[in-house]
Regions:
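Conserved alpha/beta-domain cores
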Residues: 2-157
């Protein structure tokens, strides 16, 4: 069984612990675990970490911050795609159309990167068949926490 270790990209000591752990793959996180105002610093920290450490053949899939800011998305992808990483995790994938834009942007910068869509909604789950058919994907990830927040399950009174 494989384990994937998510770690905030702004916390260097956690990245180093992950690198030295027995985990199968590291997911340095630029999304939920990093406050919005320091995401750019976290990206730079992650770049420095990857460039200045012996990665010991560790599989690394950074999770980008998927936002409405296309310039920020392209900055993350352009800077990460030239590093010694295996791929990128794309959070909040709901449909093939929006995923296609990110998929094509990543492939523009590095055609060899694995792209992992993170399904975190009912809409994303409903569209999973189209995502699988429409793209060359080897891995799909499921975010149960955000998904469960969207389910119509309220408190019992």
């Amino acid at each position: 069984m494989s384990s994937y270790l998510f770690s905030p990209a702004n916390v260097s000591k956690n990245l180093i612990k992950g690198l030295n752990s027995d985990t199968f793959a590291m997911i340095p996180d630029l999304e939920d675990s990093v406050p919005l105002e320091i995401k750019s610093n976290a990206l730079n920290n992650l770049i420095d970490f990857i460039n200045n450490n012996d990665l010991n053949n560790k599989i690394i899939y950074p999770r980008i911050h998927n936002s409405d800011d296309n310039t920020w998305i392209e900055e993350q992808i352009s800077k990460l795609s030239v590093l010694n990483i295996n791929g990128l995790v794309i959070p909040g994938v709901n449909d093939p159309k929006s995923f296609s834009k990110l998929y094509n942007l990543i492939k523009k910068y590095n055609n060899n990167l694995e792209i992992i869509p993170l399904i975190e909604s009912v809409e994303g789950l409903d569209n999973m068949k189209d995502l699988i058919r429409g793209f060359n994907l080897n891995i799909i990830s499921f975010g149960k926490y955000d998904f469960s927040l969207m389910l119509p399950v309220g408190e019992v009174e």
